[in-house]
Amino acid sequence: MNKNGSKFSMDTIISFSAIIIATASIFVAVWQGYETRKHNRLSVRPKLQISYSVDEERFGYILINNGLGPATITEIKIFIDGKEMINPGFSGYDELIDKLNFSNRRKAHSSLNPGTTIKAGETKNIILVNIEKDDNLDELLPTIYQRIGMEITYISMYNEEFIYTFPN
């Protein structure tokens, strides 16, 4: 006992208080590091989306990165009438257009292959086909859009994998 009748001296109380504060500080630092890491991952997370594109001259699909960071495509699958196209690389888009009976039209497509990186805010044409004068778009477009499906697997800068399926 000390001179005040307490079991603990002032030095002992101060020492225990310092240990408690140091332990709490370590906990807060670890938690803050975890939250910062989580924030950093979210601040560069890509978000790919496929949208219809129709104007006076062409119709088709475009790929948009609406996220905050770049997306690197690791795999792309294209389906027509529910069946996956084998090897839908650069020439696969021409095969898709042929299966839709548009081989005689002017067309454009991007080369979206594994390894393609799409930066934040960037838009890529997937497939665009020219509209002809005698096309009835009210019948043509829904038919085409119902026949095509896509699944794109991509990664972020942190190698987090995401899969986007269209239509959702």
Task: Set out the residue ranges of the language-model regions.
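Hydrophobic membrane-insertion alpha-helices, especially the h-region
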Residues: S15-A29
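Amphipathic, hydrophobic N-terminal targeting peptides for secretion and organelle import
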Residues: M1-N2, I14
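Membrane interfacial helix-start segments of signal peptides and signal-anchor transmembrane helices
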Residues: F8-F16
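Amphipathic alpha-helical "stem/stalk" segments
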Residues: N2-G5, S9, W31-N168
